[in-house]
């Protein structure tokens, strides 16, 4: 009798395990072209669970002071991991300011958002649950998307008829005021008032009642982006009654997408209505 009971318990344990592994059948696509600008392809990697609908989407934007880095760097979001969480996950490359002046990186992010909306039916994406995550310069870009949105920028790269809205963003170690940032001078458009252009591209100056929820993650000893940038951004969001969270780490340096950041991100998305 005891042997039969043990066998039954083992079967009950095994069945959920098998069902779980079957539910995690994932497709990963590399080097997908999400847009074209002046004949050059904008590339992304994507991952998603097969045969699912209503997937929240998350787009990762890499750091590198807008002049370096890539979607495949050591700090990049793992699209296969996030697909396993039940997301459509995307990591993007964007034009770097060494070859294309600002605001090229931001325009490419907006193109990626439109691509996701344009392909929502194809990949089973819930268009009302599109999220962004970035670290360092990528954190700046996603925060700008949450505050400024498309602004008056021209749509480039493609999908000009698609939606470009997002549900919320996560910025790890991102800068929010470019005119006071030590490397803010890298954000230099061609012609015009450079100071005004950097102010336009500073999320802290673009906060309105329409700003999307933002999770700010920063360490007190960040030498690349001083934590004062994050503190001031959180204060500005609070002053405008914008939903946000500020997670302040100690002695973590210039933060990347660590396991802790992933946990904070998933909790934040759940809190604002995602999965």
Stretches found by the model and what they are:
Residues 72-91:
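Short amphipathic alpha-helix adjacent to the substrate-entry channel of hydrolases
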Residues 22-52:
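N-terminal cap/lid segment of alpha/beta-hydrolase-fold proteins
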Residues 177-178, 221-225, 255:
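Acidic catalytic loop of the alpha/beta-hydrolase fold
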Residues 111-183:
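Primarily recognizes the serine-hydrolase "nucleophile elbow" in alpha/beta-hydrolase
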Residues 45, 227-275:
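C-terminal catalytic histidine-bearing segment of alpha/beta-hydrolase fold enzymes
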């Amino acid at each position: 009798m005891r042997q039969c009971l043990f066998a039954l318990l083992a079967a009950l344990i095994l069945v959920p395990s098998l069902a779980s592994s079957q539910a995690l059948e994932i497709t990963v696509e590399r080097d997908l072209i999400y847009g074209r600008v002046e004949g050059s392809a904008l590339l992304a990697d994507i991952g998603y669970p097969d045969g699912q609908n209503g997937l929240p989407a998350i787009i990762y934007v890499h750091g590198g002071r807008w002049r370096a880095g890539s979607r495949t760097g050591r700090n990049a979001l793992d699209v296969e991991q996030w697909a396993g969480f039940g997301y459509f996950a995307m990591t993007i490359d964007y034009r770097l300011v060494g070859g294309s002046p600002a605001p090229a990186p931001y325009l490419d992010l907006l193109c990626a958002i439109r691509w996701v909306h344009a392909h929502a039916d194809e990949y089973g994406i819930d268009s009302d649950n599109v999220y962004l995550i970035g670290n360092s310069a990528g954190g700046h870009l996603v925060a700008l998307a949450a505050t400024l949105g498309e602004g008056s920028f021209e749509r480039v790269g493609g999908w000009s008829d698609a939606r470009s809205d997002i549900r919320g963003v996560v910025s790890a170690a991102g800068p929010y005021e470019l005119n006071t940032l030590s490397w803010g001078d890298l954000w230099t458009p061609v012609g015009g008032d450079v100071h005004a252009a950097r102010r336009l591209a500073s999320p802290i100056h673009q906060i309105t009642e329409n700003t999307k929820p933002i999770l700010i993650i920063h360490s007190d000893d960040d030498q690349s982006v001083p934590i004062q940038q994050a503190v001031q951004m959180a204060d500005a969001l609070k002053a405008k009654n914008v939903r946000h969270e500020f997670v302040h780490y100690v002695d973590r340096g210039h933060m990347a997408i660590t396991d802790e950041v992933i946990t904070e991100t998933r909790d934040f998305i759940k809190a604002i209505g995602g999965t």
